[in-house]
């Protein structure tokens, strides 16, 4: 069931005191509830869905996969836009899959080395040093990713504008 945020009642947090629950288990907080996974067990066929399908997050990249709907009346320009979006999404998923794999491997190595040195648990302060070192080591990769991401999205925007212009011209032609 689709819910629109505008249709939801607005509740001010100042109206009543709500208990706060944090990531760590706090006394007096209810245990976290396991929510069932909602969605389809496999990707639907793009020709059978009525609109774009956004799936659950991918386990490796943490990105939500898209299935782009298209019909038989898709123009060449609309097809090139859809294929460009699919190409950029595949590139993005590939980047974040490799990045997250590298991050988790280095994080495990960091924790393992600290445990081998005699520390039973790694503190949040020690982990913050790892996070900063990881970001410092990969800043060039992140800059290049951002530049590539902006360029690819600019290409998508120009194609989307051309598709919309084509639709407007076709609509004007039908009305005249």
UniProtKB/Swiss-Prot annotation:
> Does the record bear Mitochondrion in its keywords?
yes
Question: Is the keyword Mitochondrion assigned to this protein?
Answer: yes
Cite the InterPro entries for this sequence.
Answer: COA8 (IPR018796)
Q: TM spans, by residue?
A: none
Gene Ontology biological process terms in this record: intrinsic apoptotic signaling pathway
Q: Which UniProt keywords apply?
A: Membrane, Mitochondrion, Mitochondrion inner membrane, Transit peptide
Q: Name one GO cellular component term.
A: mitochondrion
Presequence boundaries: 1-23
Give the highest taxon in the source lineage: Eukaryota
* Cellular compartment(s): Mitochondrion inner membrane
Q: What happens when the gene is disrupted?
A: (Microbial infection) After infection with E.chaffeensis, results in reduced bacterial replication rate and increased survival.
**Primary role:** May be required for cytochrome c complex (COX) assembly and function, COX being the terminal component of the mitochondrial respiratory chain. (Microbial infection) Required for optimal replication of E.chaffeensis.
Q: Which family does it belong to?
A: Belongs to the COA8 family.
Q: Mind telling me which PANTHER family this protein's record contains? A: APOPTOGENIC PROTEIN 1, MITOCHONDRIAL (PTHR31107), CYTOCHROME C OXIDASE ASSEMBLY FACTOR 8 (PTHR31107:SF2)
What protein name does the entry list? COA8 family protein CG14806, mitochondrial
Organism of origin is: Drosophila melanogaster (Fruit fly)
């Amino acid at each position: 069931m689709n819910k629109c945020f505008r249709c939801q009642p607005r509740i001010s947090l100042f109206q009543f005191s709500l208990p706060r629950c944090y990531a760590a288990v706090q006394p007096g907080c209810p245990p976290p509830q396991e929510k069932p996974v909602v969605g389809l067990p496999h990707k639907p066929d793009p020709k059978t869905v009525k609109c774009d399908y956004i799936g659950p997050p991918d386990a490796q990249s943490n990105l939500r996969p898209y299935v782009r709907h298209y019909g038989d009346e898709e123009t060449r320009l609309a097809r090139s836009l859809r294929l460009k979006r699919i190409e950029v999404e595949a590139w993005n998923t590939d980047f974040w899959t490799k990045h997250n794999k590298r991050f988790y491997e280095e994080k495990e190595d960091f924790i393992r080395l600290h445990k081998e040195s005699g520390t039973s648990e790694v503190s949040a302060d020690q982990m913050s040093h790892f996070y900063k070192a990881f970001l410092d080591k990969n800043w060039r990769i992140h800059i290049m990713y951002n530049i590539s991401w902006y360029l690819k999205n600019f290409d998508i925007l120009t194609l989307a504008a051309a598709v919309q212009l084509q639709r407007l011209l076709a609509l004007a032609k039908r009305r005249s």
